[in-house]
Amino acid sequence: MDPVEAYGRVKSSILEHHKWFDSSLPMIASENVTSPAVRKAMTSDFGHRYAEGWVGERVYAGTKYIDEVESIAMELVKRLFNVKFADVRPISGVVANLAVYTAFTNPGDVAMALPITKGGHISMGPLRGSEGQFIGGTAGAVRGLDVKYLAFDDHNMNVDVDKSIKRIEENKPKLVILGGSVILFPHPVKELSDVCKSVGALLHYDAAHVAGLIAGKQFQQPMEEGADVMTMSTHKTFFGPQHGAVITNDEEKFERIKLANFPGLLSNHHLHSVAALALAAAEMLAFGEEYARAVVRNAKALAQALHDEGFSVVAEHLGFTQSHQVLLDVDALGGGHRCEKLLEEANIIVNRNLLPWDIKRGRSFKDPGGLRLGVSELTRLGMGEEEMKEIAKLYRKVLLDREDPKKVAGEVSELRKRFRNVKYAFEEGPAYEY
């Protein structure tokens, strides 16, 4: 391809993407949208610079303003989560997790987490499964950990406390990880903290999905319930840039985390993202509680509305959800892959997802039986419970009534015309301007 043609096509594709999302319903639970101020910080000169090491101890010159911004980011994160120590250098949630693995384990050590099929994240997974099949999870593939699984209660969509206590006592892991990529309800941090202490295991809470809800005081508070460390990504319910952080209340543990991050894992830590995180953290301090409350309210409203429209919504007996996520079982509708593609044609952007019982019914991650829906981004656009009811009707038209998705896309576009700006920010503005 001619370089001039390639240049033009890339610019055109970026523009078309923004136009598409400006008239779509972005409902992927691991995504959100930043404010114009945060977006602008991402394109600042900070993105051209290096600042290896710790604030005040850099091995590069020219960092006095970078140090100030990173110091503010750390202070704001500590305030948000009411902790003593925060490292905001990890460039993602996965790297934040890897910092914990590096700081507190050695290759061959036993770690315990939920399997991917039960909501665990790939960063917690083993290198290979029990039958030798390649999984490639970060914990196993990168750190060389021997990953065993916590028990999961499919009916209640949560860690099975009693069975997990027994497994922890039997395996005596160095590390126990809670949290995951499917998390409808708070995980049993307090219930597992004593057994972790008794076997000498570090209790690590991965808050990648729910960090914004925790900061907004609308979810569990893992650091108050017994977690030793907490990691997060900063772009899901925490409406910042794609970045990461690690927090703790223990100074000795924090020093180990710092050394794991540098020199071990990070040289340049994406300073434009640190600046953007500082701004997002300030927004979260000012607006986070109101935002998180709206997110949970919208998730519950969407789940109930989908149920009322005739969908099989997971965990009805528990009120469906206490987080930003809603799970649909669409096995009877042709599976997650089919439903995801039909909804995408209607400009409703979701992702297919494994359900805990999918393996038993012969499904895989390529065509699972579930859809994982998120309301974080729609909430940032200002949508509320009434819009969740409208959206449930659009799902019904596409998946149950089998209307032409292209026709429904027009209705989606009409709905979105009322919600173009980012809310819960000091400077509201167009969400998908480019």
From Swiss-Prot:
| Cell location | Cytoplasm
A GO BP term, please?
A: tetrahydrofolate metabolic process
- The disulfide bridges present are none
Instruction: List required co-factors.
Output: pyridoxal 5'-phosphate
Q: Which residues bind (6S)-5,6,7,8-tetrahydrofolate?
A: 120-122, 255
Signal peptide range: none
Please provide one cellular component term from the Gene Ontology annotations of this protein: cytoplasm
Report the EC code(s) recorded for this entry.
2.1.2.-
* EC primary class: transferase
Tell me the protein's name.
Serine hydroxymethyltransferase
- The species this protein was found in: Korarchaeum cryptofilum (strain OPF8)
Gene name in the database record: glyA
